[in-house]
Amino acid sequence: MTSSSPKTRKSSTKSKAKRGSKSKKAAEIIAVQRLSKTPPPFRNKVVDKKVLKNLVAWAFKHHGTAATAAMADNLKDLGFRYATQAAVSISVDDLKVPEAKQDLLGQAEELITATEECYRLGEITEVERHTKVIDTWTETNERLVDAVKKNFNQNDPLNSVWMMANSGARGNMSQVRQLVGMRGLMANPQGEIIDLPIRTNFREGLTVTEYVISSYGARKGLVDTALRTADSGYLTRRLVDVAQDVIVREEDCGTTRSILISAEDGKFGNRLVGRLTSEQVVNADEEVLAERDTPIDPQLSKKFEQSNMQGVRVRSPLTCEATRSVCRKCYGWALAHNQLVDLGEAVGIVAAQSIGEPGTQLTMRTFHTGGVSTAETGVVRSTLSGKVEFGSKARVRGYRTPHGVEAQQAEVDFNLSIVPTSGGKPQKIDIPIGSLLFVDNGQNIDIDVTVAQIASGTVQKSVEKATKDVICDLAGQVRYETIIQPREVTDRQGNITLKAQRLGRLWVLAGDVYNLPPNALPVVSGNVSVKEGQVLAEASQASEFGGEVRLRDSIGDSREVQIVTTSMTLDDFKLLEESTHSGEIWHLEAQDNTRYRLNTIPGSKIGNNEVIAELSDDRFKTETGGLIKYAPGLTIKKARSAKNGYEVSKGGTLLWIPQETHEINKDISLLMIKDRQWIEAGTEVVKDIFSQTAGIVTVTQKNDILREIIVRSGTFKLCKESKALDRFEGDGQIVNPGETIAKGIKTDSMVMVQSVETPEGKGLLLRSVEEFNIPDQAQLPELKHVKQPKGPSLGVKASQRLAYKDGELIKSVEGVELLKTQLMLETFDTTPQMTVDVEVIQDLNSKGDRLKLVILESILVRRDTTSDSSHGSTHTELQIENAQVVSAGDVVATTQILCKQEGVVQLPDAVDGDPVRRLIVEREEDTITIDSKGTTLLKVGQRVVDGDFVSKDQSIDACGEIENIDGKKVKLRLGRPYMVSPDSVLHVRDGDLVQRGDGLALLVFERQKTGDIVQGLPRIEELLEARRPRDSAILCKKSGTVDIKKGDDDDSVVVSIIEDNDVISEYPILLGRNVMVRNSQQVIAGEFLTDGPVNPHELLECFFTDLRDKKPLMDAAQEAIAKLQHRMVSEVQNVYKSQGVAIDDKHIEVIVRQMTSKVRIEDAGDTTFLPGELIELRQVEDTNQAISITGGAPSEFTPVLLGITKASLNTDSFISAASFQETTRVLTEAAIEGKSDWLRGLKENVIIGRLIPAGTGFSGFVEELNAEAGPHPDILAEDPAGYRRIQNLRPDYTVDMPSSPVAKNTAVLDDPSEEDLEATRSRHGIDPTTSNFAAFARPVGDDELSAEDQMPDPAALEGLQEEGLLSDE
């Protein structure tokens, strides 16, 4: 086996190969032999994915990439060769369904039937039933997976499907389960789990229903994949942007700060590997395991575990003090090659990609979980029969589980013991806080009884509020149990809802409920017996206005009754019908033979102020188009719209100046006359177009296209008198008869004069003006009105309407009608929807037709209907006859609602002013009578459920309310209980009548979000964007002792925290929030008082305010930030871990560092900062130290948490920020502030087109800094990343910094010796490693200071003189 000869090695491998499952061992041996000189050890072990992974990792670590690649290639060839030889393949016969499946399904069905029964008896709510069903199927599914594994393992270990899934080659148990177990539960598109599971698998085949349900999940998977890919890409972009300028720029920042990595269950896993220790690590025996700055490899990590170390302090990017970068030692190993990271490595980009990339994987894992799984808690069963004892420490409170089981929850940690009845050793169980107990203290229990469900630590699960409707299964009357205590709640909009305050039942007592039609009134009183067919209620339909009845033929389900309210016949007009080629035209002819053309046709409907007919009148018709002018005196009525013309209010004269307008739109080559030429009538102006009048022609053209030709008729007179020409320039003027127009030009008639320039010369055009006289009133025969004392009235009025407004030019060749005389309908006191019908009637005297206008009231009368589940049968009777005259308010028809089955009528309690909309008949089938065999234990009005006892040994097998007890006979009205939980919204009130299918209540409950990456990616985004969640948990602001009191209303609670200095802070907690603390508990700042998602900003504030009282500002800020950072890192890790994605902590730390690096200035003190400005914490620290030395006031600040988008936009580089988002805003602000970009990150340099300061470009960056530092290289010793870029430093180490006037004049020597500096440092307690001496202030003389201000601070002078740094002068 270990022979070095290749031939023997090959043959020996071949002889082993035929042992099926051991085929892959040879892989390890061959591959390993190629790499090592010594013969490898023989390992008899099945090689699966995990072993292969470790093997490749080992080879890579010890032998490099080339050898590993060759080995992997050999392994691949080997695998394929033996797979071919063994003929591994998959066929349908390989899919073997375990026999245990049917039994498991049977057990699940039994459990669910029992749950349904509990629900029917009103012991659990609809939500609890749903949860229980889903959990039952989830558990069954898990058990079936185990059965599948067991079946393959025992009966067919070499099954191809099993080998494939088990070795990690392809597929996983979740997929194998669907092939041979059961497909399981599916979710609908809203993400709710459907409680009908898919019981079959793909081997057996799905039923149609199951196929349709399972296609939900498939669709969801596809859509999710598409959406999440985009989301994940955008997340990566934001991460890259926030961290792109984090580059390793220093060897060692020299920090003493560190983070503690604690062991989980005594194991560190990979969490320490690649880190450097921040201090000497010693074990319990004081033995040094590692010095400071020792890189931790897997062996050292194991050594720590073996020494039972609970935690190790390591260096981390979170605590690195390198300005805006990370040093090599804080970052640790670069995970690509497990060596210390190189200088110039762009670790920010690596971190961003490491976090963003798994986002796409997360997406693919849609929902493998069956919803709410209870796997996080362990169930403890009794191992013996005996008596339960809680012990003296125990404190428990009542609790209802999500499955509706009444249990007790532990409020403290305690030990529970079961003392055996037969004597012997008791069973001890540790009960941690929050665990559920299903037994009582002192209870005797049997062996294998569920005692408790142990809580696995306080996991903050993400929950969401959800609602579920409770739908009524039978018609009947609603009765509340008094325990519900409903109360009315008014929301912000003023809507009132009824809410249950306690857990209790709503009962629906059976009966036949009748929905009454609108305006129906009961004709029977309550508690009266009725027979089948008896009238229960009556609805009547009455006429509103009265009039003559017309009965129409019935249409569909109803019959129309028309009542003629008002009618009017136009007796003065004959109605004539004329046939034309376009159809029938109707005319009205008056006695003076004037004709009106009818605008409507008989049989149609018209409304108020609509035109009935128009006068056919040629008196106001023109021959051509032209210009219209109103003479003074003619007035029109003001109207909203001029759609129907302008109504004349006072008659007068209308002036008309004819003008012929031809609209052409042809090429100019077709023009046959000249512009402004005089033409005669009949002249061809354009090909095939002739002028109808004589006059001067005006041609309008554009881009060689003829638009219009206008002919202005009249007489043309040449005129040289410029005064006259100027007078009639433009639109011209109207001149009356007999007036002199110009020298030698006079007119006999009214004309319009205009100056015109023609080819012959300038002159005046005298255009004739036609006058139309309009009377004040339209000339019409007598019109009459029909007035009624009550109800609508009718009338006809005449109106004259002008079609055009004053000064309007009508472009036309044909004539137009200037005035229309119209007959209009006028109605009074009508409702808007009331219309007038136009009818034709015969005049008996003159044998002609007349026009009749009729106002109708239409009433739809219901036809008889047969009964259905919610309505009784109805019978409708008409109370009128055709042509009968009825008065207003007379009944036209009555509808009777008839009883379906005999029984006793009950009317609901009348609510103020509301009519009765439903009534109920209690039938014989709604009650049962029970013969009691002994003394009755029940009372009248008591409600009972299945299994309750009538007498000592006799139980009931129905639910309902006891109506009557007569001796031994007990009458029970059947009913159905529905459990409602506290805070449910009640849709019905006590005593209401409901139909089957009505909603009774809306249950409000909290459910866990499905443990699924669909929650994962948004959750990561929520964390990294530092979003403020809705309904966040209430956090404790200061440390202290808890005191819980009742609030003002019954169910609210006030939690008071009593601090050490006896200050009390109160936190009112609303109904529906779970309090997470108990009385007398000690809490620290930032601890949860209620459940819910945490608001990270609030958490940071809590940490900071608490620490601010105990520590200096800088320390408080750093410690608060550190606490928050630790929490953020673990939250992000939890999401990825739950999906099985491994990301190294340091990547998340780099991003979190960027999110928490800034502080908000509250008070600038004597620094140059502005209040509200966001500044790097390190920069504030340096400035404050410098200011405090010069005696100025340091700035006050609060730490802030920025989401990744905000952090990217708040970066110092405006080029980077502008290329990310909100380009215009960022650039504008940068321009206004006169910012400089120091091109530190990668993005800025790429955009500018320079070499990036990372990788090989890093050395160039360092050289540039050295050149800049010039004569003061020691500046770089203190600031190796060159962050100050010596931008505002003068060669003599000074910066102008405003400070207090006194401090301004304190003399500081320019270049003190190193010893002098050292002495001053020790005197003022300055740490040279953290202080930036380049930022020390230099004195500046200020002429504006008073003599007093110019005086130096005596104390400061004395100090400097003592040090010998200042001469006596």
Swiss-Prot record:
Enzyme class, UniProt record, top EC level: transferase
Biased composition (Low complexity): 1357-1369
SUPFAM superfamilies: beta and beta-prime subunits of DNA dependent RNA-polymerase
Keyword tags: DNA-directed RNA polymerase, Metal-binding, Nucleotidyltransferase, Transcription, Transferase, Zinc
Gene Ontology biological process: DNA-templated transcription
InterPro entries: DNA-dir_RpoC2_beta_pp, DNA-dir_RpoC_beta_prime, RNA_pol_Rpb1_3, RNA_pol_Rpb1_3_sf, RNA_pol_Rpb1_4, RNA_pol_Rpb1_5, Rpb1_funnel_sf
CC annotations in GO: DNA-directed RNA polymerase complex
Stored CDD domains: RNAP_beta'_C
Cofactor needs: Zn(2+)
Documented EC number(s): 2.7.7.6
Cofactor note: Binds 1 Zn(2+) ion per subunit.
Bias (Basic residues): 7-24
Biased composition annotated in UniProt, kind: Acidic residues: 1342-1351
MF annotations from Gene Ontology: DNA binding; DNA-directed RNA polymerase activity; zinc ion binding
Catalytic reactions on record: RNA(n) + a ribonucleoside 5'-triphosphate = RNA(n+1) + diphosphate
Stretch list, region Disordered: 1-26, 1294-1369
Binding site for Zn(2+): C253, C320, C327, C330
Function: DNA-dependent RNA polymerase catalyzes the transcription of DNA into RNA using the four ribonucleoside triphosphates as substrates.
Family: Belongs to the RNA polymerase beta' chain family. RpoC2 subfamily.
Self-association state and partner proteins as the record states: In cyanobacteria the RNAP catalytic core is composed of 2 alpha, 1 beta, 1 beta', 1 gamma and 1 omega subunit. When a sigma factor is associated with the core the holoenzyme is formed, which can initiate transcription.
Protein name as annotated: DNA-directed RNA polymerase subunit beta'
Organism (species): Prochlorococcus marinus (strain NATL2A)
Taxonomic path: Bacteria, Bacillati, Cyanobacteriota, Cyanophyceae, Synechococcales
Gene that this polypeptide is encoded by: rpoC2
